[in-house]
């Protein structure tokens, strides 16, 4: 049997499994792996400027393809950089293998140069994290790491000392891997009880998350059967909103439409494939004994952790609904559904649409107008990555899914700077598709070096910068807490000029009348392009339901700002947001 280095075995195994690239930054302890990539056909090394970006890119590729993606970092600071991207991938269920190279094995525990303990560091953001002690040991560890990442839809970390990577091993490894996983069949008892609860309720509302992927037809069939409005979290938007006659929008701080009210008014709320964390936007106890809440999820650990349940159903959403639909016997009226659909239409044509009407003369440009125009101009199968912060809001409210588009961000980890590196991963995975990074200037500033990565690999990535010289979401959070915004603004930056300095095509848009023409031209330009749109820093996102506490917070903050001499600032903010207030 031919002998080869463990690094070569690792790279060959990944290539044979279908992995086409490894994202990372080269470094001495990682050299055996990088050299194995160099000499192996069918797999490439994607050089990024920060290992954090490599982890984000791998996570994005895994989320888009559903297949294993790989990133790597050298010993010490190199692999510790990966942690934000790995947290993001792990919490969003992306199968990623991270290769964390390590100092020479004989030096571990001596306080050696760049020594850390990656086998401890990455425990919380992975399902599997182990150190390879020898080449022979590594073959088994590699198999377990890959299988665990695929089976549990999350991160595995392989800690690999550089000298171990160079050790010779027998090869090739011929272990089989289970890459086609089965779905969770629900038990008959909970399905029967679910049918009873649905039949007993006069009004039913469905609230869905990312777990309804692959269950669209079943969800719509249930809604039709029981005349139920369908609301969604951002993670469920791309799978359920389009061509949906039962859609009532989104709940949460990013929300819009009638989703919140529909949920509060229903006798029975069914949570489908969602781990929506904001319990204040979920059905609350109000003394109505008729209120019932059911949750259906393939991950039993998520059942009931956000809100108390009357029934928890462990099962795949599609299989569960297929099982329950034939058991239903009651007939529901249309009145509740029609009332919620009417309220949803009013909300969309009112506050949500306010910033996209008659805005051609308003400067700085309203960010909602930018997002709505982007939605109209982008390709039917475009991939949108959205930065955490206000870009999440604009993406949630104005980017329209159609079954072919993809829209995602840092849904659970909520880290800034995710959009650009995720767009890099999307562009590498699907070079023929239009990939658009909806970047906030705050997020872009954190990992701006990845513009060099976009240029180096000549990616067909469009980077749309919402340039408001402010951390907009942080400003909103401070105002809600009754605090005047402080430390959220910075001096104006010309990001188009920076991109041009890197060698990327760029355009700076400041005139609302020219937005559509300039944006269309930029999107149609082949290759990388940065679109720097100067937007209104005072545009705030109003949630679908404003609480008394939030009103008090705004009032307190406004008073403090005015007393501090900021009368003009408050007037600007009021003028920018008056039309967007819920009515």
Positions of the model-derived regions?
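Glycine-rich phosphate/diphosphate-binding loops that line cofactor/substrate pockets in enzymes
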Residues: 9-19, 60-66, 90, 148-152, ...
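Active-site diphosphate/adenylate-binding microenvironment
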Residues: 10, 15, 28, 33-38, ...
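Thiamine diphosphate
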Residues: 31-105, 107-114, 253, 258-277, 304-306, 393-471, ...
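Glycine-rich, anion-gripping cofactor-binding loops and their flanking helix/strand elements
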Residues: 63, 210-294, 402-433, 445-449, ...
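Conformationally flexible catalytic loops at phosphate/diphosphate-handling active centers
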Residues: 116, 144, 148-200, 238, ...
């Amino acid at each position: 049997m031919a002998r080869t280095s463990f690094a070569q075995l690792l790279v060959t195994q990944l290539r044979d499994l279908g992995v086409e690239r490894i994202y990372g930054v080269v470094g001495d302890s990682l050299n055996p792996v990088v050299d194995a990539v160099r000499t192996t056909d069918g797999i490439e090394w994607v050089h990024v400027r920060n290992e954090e970006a490599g982890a984000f890119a791998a996570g994005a590729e895994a989320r888009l393809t559903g297949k294993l993606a790989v990133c790597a970092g050298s010993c010490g600071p190199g692999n510790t950089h990966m942690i934000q991207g790995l947290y993001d991938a792990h919490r969003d269920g992306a199968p990623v293998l991270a290769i964390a190279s390590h100092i020479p094995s004989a030096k571990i525990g001596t306080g050696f140069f760049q020594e850390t303990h990656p086998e401890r560091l990455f425990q919380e953001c992975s399902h599997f994290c182990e150190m390879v002690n020898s080449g022979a040991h590594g073959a088994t560890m590699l198999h377990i790491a890959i299988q665990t990442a695929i089976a549990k839809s999350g991160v595995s970390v392989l800690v690999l000392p550089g000298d171990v990577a160079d050790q010779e091993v027998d090869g090739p490894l011929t272990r089989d891997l289970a890459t086609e996983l089965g779905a969770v069949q629900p038990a008959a008892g909970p399905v029967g009880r679910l049918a009873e609860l649905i039949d007993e309720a006069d009004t039913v509302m469905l609230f869905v998350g990312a777990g309804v992927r692959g269950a669209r037809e079943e969800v719509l069939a249930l809604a039709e059967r029981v005349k139920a409005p369908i609301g969604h979290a951002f993670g469920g938007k791309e799978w359920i909103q389009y061509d949906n006659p039962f859609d009532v929008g989104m709940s949460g701080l990013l929300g819009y439409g009638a989703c919140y009210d529909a949920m509060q008014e229903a006798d029975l709320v069914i949570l489908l494939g969602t781990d929506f964390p904001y319990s204040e936007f979920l059905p609350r106890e109000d003394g109505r004994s008729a209120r019932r809440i059911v949750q259906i999820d393939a991950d039993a650990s998520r059942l009931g952790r956000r809100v108390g349940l009357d029934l928890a159903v462990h099962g795949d959403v599609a299989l569960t609904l297929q099982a329950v639909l034939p058991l239903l016997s009651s007939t529901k009226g249309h009145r509740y559904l029609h009332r919620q659909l009417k309220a949803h239409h009013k909300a969309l044509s009112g506050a949500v649409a306010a910033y996209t009407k008659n805005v051609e003369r308003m400067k700085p440009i309203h960010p909602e107008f930018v997002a709505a125009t982007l939605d109209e101009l982008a390709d039917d199968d475009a991939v949108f990555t959205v930065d955490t912060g206000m870009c999440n809001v604009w993406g949630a409210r104005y980017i329209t899914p159609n079954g072919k588009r993809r829209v995602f961000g840092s849904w659970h980890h909520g880290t800034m700077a995710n959009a650009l590196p995720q767009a890099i991963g999307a562009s590498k995975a699907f070079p023929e598709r239009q990939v658009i990074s909806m970047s906030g200037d705050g997020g872009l500033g954190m990992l701006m070096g990845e513009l060099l990565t976009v240029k180096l690999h000549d990616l067909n990535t469009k980077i749309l910068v919402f340039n408001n010289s402010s951390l907009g979401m942080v400003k909103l959070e401070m105002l809600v807490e009754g605090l005047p915004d402080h430390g959220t603004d910075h001096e104006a930056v010309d990001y188009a000029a920076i991109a041009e300095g890197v060698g990327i095509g760029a355009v700076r848009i400041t005139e609302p009348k020219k937005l559509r023409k300039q944006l269309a031209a930029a999107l149609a330009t082949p290759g990388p392009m940065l679109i720097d749109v100067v937007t209104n820093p005072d545009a705030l996102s109003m949630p679908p339901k404003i609480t008394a506490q939030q009103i008090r917070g705004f009032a307190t903050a406004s008073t403090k700002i005015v007393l501090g001499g900021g009368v003009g600032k408050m007037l600007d903010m009021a003028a920018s947001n008056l039309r967007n207030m819920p009515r």
